[in-house]
Amino acid sequence: MRRSGPELWKTLTSVSKSGQKKGRRNTRQPVRPLSRFYRIGSSPMKVEFAGLNAPMRLNDESLMTIAEQTEDEIRDLMGGTKKILEERDTGKKKRNREKLHPMERGFSGTQLVGQKLGAPPPVDGVNFDDFETYCLEVKRTSNMTNVFGRVHTMSALVVTGNGRGLAGYAVGKAPIHRTTTAIINGIGMASRKIFHVELHEGRTIYQDFYAECRNTRVFAQRRPRGFGLTCHPRLIKICEAIGIKDIYVKVEGSTKNYLALTHAFVTGLLNQETHQQLAERKGLHVVEMSPSRHFLPQIVASPISTELKTEETLEALDRLNLDDFYGEGRYPLRKPKALPFFSNLEGHLDARWRKHPFRNQESTMIRLIADNMVPRWTRDARAAWAEQRNERMTTGVEPMPLGIGLSHVVPKKDD
């Protein structure tokens, strides 16, 4: 029984209904157009069979003959298949992807997530030329409806800012497989939800704060100039959009819920208060004690419209340190550094005991050289300094130091 080509291919490519549910449909090979590459009854050698691909002759008794071919015909026949394959490859449309600089790439490869997307479009005549936009997340969401069943959509979390305290974030949505549309909708919504963040010295936050959203907990700490951004990769993009340059943020709990992470961090930024606002609310001076000034107090802000409190009117809550004043009494988990395996071995303990008498020698050396008491840390210089100090003590110029094992010289009473 003769069968057609489509019927023969169906025996190789067909899958039952139960097999389609189990994923066997993707394992079947597609239909190959064999007629483009090979014609049944022909071969590269041009073999002729009487009655099949050649006419039958009365006086010809040979059933098979090989036709003579020129070199050009042989070359064209051998290169025909190669030419068809090349035409098939060149017919496909290839996506021309622009090669990005390594510093301009996103969080993963060539994806848009984490890349700079430019300024938002103008809204009601307001331009955002100095703004920069980042896409923090693109994901597929689903919603079960009673009419259409499970409806899938694309969701994009976008943040935009000018790097000087103005920023905004929003979630844009679009139909399934419309990632670009979701990002564009998110950019337009973020440009309509602009908020302002107060920055200390234009680079960091005013005080350490704690914020949470769902199962995401954020501990933000201010840092000195030049520290940089040490935080979650998504928070780095948010800080760049806002203009924060020096900060340390510890994230506990869920670190993959980027919307909750963004909301918690922005909430903590908006709830902080400046030094002047703190001075007005508490009626006290805000004082900074920096090691660069040997911890001498320097007044940063003073109350203007509020009466200044005195020592008698101070309460116990007013005597808190600035680090303990904020944060709702919560502190980030700081695990102690794990001890090495040899910390309690006998040999290591003996070595520490032998080094114990010299434990302060390095700090003493630095102090003596810094105070210009010893010009160089050599034996001759130290001996000369010790001899000079001994002479001053013997002559009474300097008092004799009193410490452990030393006491006042008390004359013995005469009986």
Curated annotation (Swiss-Prot):
Cellular component aspect of the GO annotation: mitochondrial small ribosomal subunit
Signal sequence residues: none
Binding partners and assembly: Component of the mitochondrial ribosome small subunit (28S) which comprises a 12S rRNA and about 30 distinct proteins.
InterPro entries listed in its UniProt record: Ribosomal_Su5_D2-typ_SF, Ribosomal_uS5, Ribosomal_uS5_C, Ribosomal_uS5_N, Ribosomal_uS5_N_CS, Ribosomal_uS5m_N, Ribsml_uS5_D2-typ_fold_subgr
Listed name of the protein: Small ribosomal subunit protein uS5m
Source species taxonomy: Eukaryota, Metazoa, Ecdysozoa, Nematoda, Chromadorea
Renumbered residue ranges of the record's region Disordered: 1-31, 396-415
Gene that encodes the chain: mrps-5
Compartments reported by the entry: Mitochondrion
Protein family (similarity comment): Belongs to the universal ribosomal protein uS5 family.
GO biological process, one term: translation
Gene3D superfamilies referenced in this protein's UniProt entry, alphabetically: 3.30.160.20, 3.30.230.10
